[in-house]
């Protein structure tokens, strides 16, 4: 289920990027708006995915110390 969540959120991010490409304000700096929004969505997705996957598959297993 963990990998599926990452894939679904990635598809949602791609959809939001495509929508932002067409909905961005028109004018002299349209391409700046488009790239800024797409980069924002992709960076937020990467930050979330790396954090989520690091918690899903930790490098060191948690250990319990009994006294």
Curated annotation (Swiss-Prot):
Membrane topology: Multi-pass membrane protein
PANTHER family, sorted: V-TYPE PROTON ATPASE SUBUNIT (PTHR12263:SF0), VACUOLAR ATP SYNTHASE SUBUNIT H (PTHR12263)
Physiological role: Subunit of the V0 complex of vacuolar(H+)-ATPase (V-ATPase), a multisubunit enzyme composed of a peripheral complex (V1) that hydrolyzes ATP and a membrane integral complex (V0) that translocates protons. V-ATPase is responsible for acidifying and maintaining the pH of intracellular compartments.
Compartments it resides in: Vacuole membrane
Gene name tied to this protein: vma9
Gene Ontology molecular function: ATP hydrolysis activity; proton-transporting ATPase activity, rotational mechanism
Chain ranges passing through the membrane: 3-23, 36-56
Coiled coil: none
GO cellular component, one term: fungal-type vacuole membrane
UniProt entry keywords in alphabetical sequence: Hydrogen ion transport, Ion transport, Membrane, Transmembrane, Transmembrane helix, Transport, Vacuole
Record-given protein name: V-type proton ATPase subunit e
Classification via Pfam families: ATP_synt_H
InterPro entries hit by this protein: ATPase_V0-cplx_e1/e2_su
GO biological process: proton transmembrane transport; transmembrane transport; vacuolar acidification
